[in-house]
Amino acid sequence: MARTTPIERYRNIGISAHIDAGKTTTTERILFYTGVSHKIGEVHDGAATMDWMEQEQERGITITSAATTAFWSGMSQQFPQHRINVIDTPGHVDFTIEVERSMRVLDGAVMVYCAVGGVQPQSETVWRQANKYHVPRIAFVNKMDRTGANFLRVVEQLKTRLGANAVPLQLPIGAEDNFKGVVDLVKMKAINWNEEDQGMTFNYDDIPADMVDICEEWHNNLIEAAAESSEELMEKYLGGEDLTEEEIKGALRQRVLATEIILVTCGSAFKNKGVQAMLDAVVEYLPSPTDIPAIKGINEDETEGERHANDDEPFAALAFKIATDPFVGNLTFFRVYSGIVESGATVYNSVKQKRERFGRIVQMHANKREEIKEVRAGDIAAAIGLKDVGTGDTLCDQNAPIILERMEFPEPVISVAVEPKTKADQEKMGIALGRLAQEDPSFRVHTDEESGETIISGMGELHLDIIVDRMKREFKVEANIGKPQVSYRETIRTRVNDIEGKHAKQSGGRGQYGHVVIDLYPLDPEGPGYEFVNEIKGVVIPGEYIPAVDKGIQEQLKSGPLAGYPVVDLGVRLHFGSYHDVDSSELAFKLAASIAFKAAFAKANPVLLEPIMKVEVETPPEYVGDVIGDLSRRRAMVSGQEATDFAVKINAEVPLSEMFGYATDLRSQTQGRASYSMEPLKYSEAPKNVADAIIEARRK
């Protein structure tokens, strides 16, 4: 089957923005103008096509990136048909994992900004992710019809807050209620869309008289940006010659692909103005799969390999999202980097080292799907029937195995206990949590050995709320949520010698007798955690009872004498004791050992250890004082600061118990413009006042 669209006419793009910049509405308009969707879905009616999970429609926010395919030939049908694969990405900070994951598989991105709110905090996080993966991008300043809309202010913020070399491609005609259309600064013509057919048709008109001067000024700014692409064009420009439209567009495209500039378009998706011209910009300025460097990977022999966007190379694809579909089970979204694969073919999962069979392959439009026979280099599609494929796995030709760059996923930062409301929910909850963890690598589940509770961990409070909500809706599991928990540990600080433990019951008949003498000493935290040394000389204690002594002490380690937390980093030396021919038994020596251990532990300067997190906060410079002040109140040790042009990174070590609710506090301190990450670092001694309070609470 031949390729229907040449790969040079593919555009794999993400639409990315802060919550409420109007990103989902923008995507809806793309689907409408490209002829995919006949009735425009409005977010504020809860009917948007891309937001297909129930919680998304209720909360009006996008949680899962739905991938969809559309075709576009230009506003005036001026191009051959291009295939645009659109990935809609979430804009909430608890879902950055989804954004990060889709950045991996995109070739270009459209950053949507609100003309009133401008560059918001999450836009800064998304921007950093796009930089990390060198994604060429253009900007769309949306909501030009809103009160307070100001296009040039947003362009300025792109420069100052993000350090972007922002170059307007258009200027708005009017703003707020008076927003009429845009001026195309390359053609120097006004574009007015027809309101009667929801903007499907438009006219090129002369630039309004009161805008001629400002348009000239920004037209020159655009030409200058184009001329900087090569010495040849620069000479032509400085020599006073006019550049042709082709030269201008070619030069701008070259600079966008090199991520040297970001072209800025504008409009109001809600009012059906501007998205059409932004689609033209996607085709004209964003890369096709062949414009970006070959993807790197690791061959079977650990050498570096790569795959070019070419049908003739061996098949290689990256699974970037797993979604559970109510009708077909798991859908694995994947991006094909090279080669061709047909439905029914067997491929190799090089990360798990297993073979997988592609059952059916579907192309998604939001959550409707169309079955296709094959996919080729550059395609984005979803497979049904893959058994054991996780996010970030590589699917490839069995005869040419390669592992494409692995994605790095952040460690979860918050944990809570969940318990099913009824016995019937118990088993269903296990299945539901397993499914959700497979879909979302930033969500983890484990059973706490000490309490037996099921603990779920994720990227923030909203993240876990939504997980619990999905358990309820999709899997019909009712669960109660506990308070966030911290795991403490206990240990000793000084050595104690010759501590005795005796268990004797000898009041006639078969008695019980065990007697041990031990030393207790601290071990290095990097060491084994526990050691038992038997130094019994002669037969003061017969050899068969020695393991019972060790076992008696190990049982005590599970729940320490201070507050019932696990005991770590200590050693025991057994060096004396006595026994009775008739009354001694394993049980008696186990009990004697536990008596000796408790007595020794109490004298060995016992302390409580608390988990310390390594925390990194990235904040605009103006909030550094507030952020550090707040961290100090949380008993943080700030270990360093590092400033870039637009943000300051603060590194600190903070006790986990002080970090609950931090995401919310940090948002309010910095108007939501800071982001943070944290990971477990070490255990260290809790200050006396903190330890006393914890011990007191546990004893109640």
UniProtKB/Swiss-Prot annotation:
For this protein, what is any one GO molecular function term? GTP binding
User: Which top-level group of life is the source organism from?
Assistant: Bacteria
Q: Where is the tr-type G domain?
A: 8-290
Q: Which GO terms describe its biological process?
A: ribosome disassembly
**Any idea which UniProt keywords this protein has?**
Cytoplasm, Elongation factor, GTP-binding, Nucleotide-binding, Protein biosynthesis
Which InterPro entries does the record cross-reference, listed alphabetically?
A: EFG_II (IPR041095), EFG_III (IPR009022), EFG_III/V (IPR035647), EFG_IV (IPR047872), EFG_V (IPR035649), EFG_V-like (IPR000640), EFTu-like_2 (IPR004161), G_TR_CS (IPR031157)
| Gene3D superfamilies in the cross-refs | 3.30.230.10, 3.30.70.240, Elongation Factor G (Translational Gtpase), domain 3, P-loop containing nucleotide triphosphate hydrolases, Translation factors
Which residues participate in GTP binding? 17-24, 88-92, 142-145
Compartment(s) of residence? Cytoplasm
According to the UniProt record, one GO cellular component term is: cytoplasm
Per the record, the major location class is cytoplasm
**Record-annotated membrane-spanning stretches:** none
* Family per record: Belongs to the TRAFAC class translation factor GTPase superfamily. Classic translation factor GTPase family. EF-G/EF-2 subfamily.
Role of this protein: Catalyzes the GTP-dependent ribosomal translocation step during translation elongation. During this step, the ribosome changes from the pre-translocational (PRE) to the post-translocational (POST) state as the newly formed A-site-bound peptidyl-tRNA and P-site-bound deacylated tRNA move to the P and E sites, respectively. Catalyzes the coordinated movement of the two tRNA molecules, the mRNA and conformational changes in the ribosome.
HAMAP family linked: EF_G_EF_2_B
NCBIfam families in the record, alphabetically?
EF-G (TIGR00484), PRK12740.1-5 (NF009381), small_GTP (TIGR00231)
What is the name of this protein? Answer: Elongation factor G
State the organism named in the record: Actinobacillus succinogenes (strain ATCC 55618 / DSM 22257 / CCUG 43843 / 130Z)
